[in-house]
Amino acid sequence: MVVTGEQMSAEEFEVVVVGAGQAGVAMSEHLTNAGISHVVLERARIAERWRSERWDSLVANGPAWHDRFPSLEFEGYDPDAFVPKEAVADYFVAYAEKFKAPIRTGIDVKSVTKNSTDAGFKVITSTGEIDAKYVVAATGPFQKPAIPPVVPADVSVHQLHSSDYHNPEQLPEGGVLVVGAGSSGVQIAADLRKAGRDVYLSVGEHDRPPRRYRGRDNVWWLGVLGKWDLATPPAGAEHVTIAVSGFAGGKTVDFRDLADSGITLLGLTSSYENGILKFADDLERNIARGDKNYLSVLTEADEFIAQNNLDLPPEPEAHVLGPMPKEAVNPIREIDLAAAGITTILWATGYATDYSWLNVPGALTDAGKPAHQRGVSNANGIYFLGQAWLSRRGSAFIWGVWHDAKFLADQIQIQRSYKSYAGSARIIN
């Protein structure tokens, strides 16, 4: 059941869930199943970021059989298909309707503070106040676009974040520099190149797992090799960019292929001065790092197949890599943007957290990040959901957030049980 902001009035709920993306919908399902009164507050529409903060040609990064909640399949799509973004958003709407999730849209949460008179919280919204015993921050990992302070905002070149990009037609005529070569950057660069644009792609450190290998998708390999359930990231991998895509039916990202398509590859974007953008001499090293990751996955997969006596077709050609792109061997260290005809810089540089509305002592670190264990905050009664590595590698993904939501609902139920215990005491002589 979805209602709009004008229907809001002062109320009390046991739980307020902030955000109605995949995390908020999953949280609502488990709270509903536990019989816990709650409301989900969403500033826009259900799964809004899928609709308005992603480019038009975006598809899910995993196949339909995997990137979903357990009890509802994607209707009308092959299990191995990569579902378009609008259909993903529609999926969450349908899922919420399936169990009549108490979602209220068009409501902006302004602040959450501790009540002065009891152990609960006061939630200030754009339409009034709500008292809650527990608050779940389910605003996800994509909160505040992060643009490095490299190019001043007042230069003549047009600058935008990937969250504001929708299609090539919205950009000024001319070449485009895409900064960032993760899933978003490589897909947007390919989208622009397909439209006939001159495209430059600044490539930093990254992993690039195979899309498919020996008849199985990357998500399957991550599962059987135990990587989805890693509780902590490997050393140095906390913020590694992952270049994987469902674009064009799903192909392994290889920067050699992008170069062959006419995209000019560059190293890490480092500095800007007087119309000149400079790049680090690290492109060859960054591509080599990605290749090493790619080959390591193939090796682990081959070993798993042998150990488990699986009948999966050999794929020796997957181990053969082509020569380094010419820009890696003879790197371009600087570009005069005007002379190169570059009129747009598109920053595919990720997101920062934004919990400026959560004003509860102990809930956040000094850096403004969640202070928690498996989503249970250091501040009693506050919970976090949808963040990368919340409990495991899969925590920020559709299926992973569903399992984390179940855990948090269980924790809330446990706290309710303790707090409802009346108890008795008697003196023993």
Where do the model's predicted regions map?
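N-terminal glycine-rich dinucleotide-binding loop that anchors FAD/FMN and/or NAD(P) in oxidoreductases
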Residues: E53-D78, D217-P234
